[in-house]
Amino acid sequence: MVKLRLKRCGRKQRAVYRIVAIDVRSRREGKDLRKVGFYDPIKNQTYLNVPAILYFLEKGAQPTGTVQDILKKAEVFKELRPNQPKFN
């Protein structure tokens, strides 16, 4: 099973995160399938590769809670096809 989750980067006390598609059994810092975005909580910046995110969501990838909140704020779920499952 594939999940969309955050992968920590940056230095001590200054974390930035990559949003990645990764196998559930992998570690947080493990090998990812594809990088699909970037999130900086300190500057409150996000970059999302929306076509790649939609591809993984259509294939059944499950976003984690934090990634789901980021995607909701960016209104990515509105771009899913109507027959795809909705995420709360």
UniProtKB/Swiss-Prot annotation:
GO terms for molecular function: structural constituent of ribosome. One of its GO terms (biological process) is mitochondrial translation. It is found in: Plastid, Chloroplast. Keywords: Chloroplast, Plastid, Ribonucleoprotein, Ribosomal protein. SUPFAM superfamilies: Ribosomal protein S16 (SSF54565). Gene3D superfamilies: 3.30.1320.10. Its main location: plastid. InterPro entries: Ribosomal_bS16 (IPR000307), Ribosomal_bS16_CS (IPR020592), Ribosomal_bS16_dom_sf (IPR023803). Pfam families: Ribosomal_S16 (PF00886). One of its GO terms (cellular component) is mitochondrion. The gene is rps16. This is Small ribosomal subunit protein bS16c. The keyword Ribonucleoprotein applies. It comes from Atropa belladonna. Belongs to the bacterial ribosomal protein bS16 family. It comes from the Eukaryota.
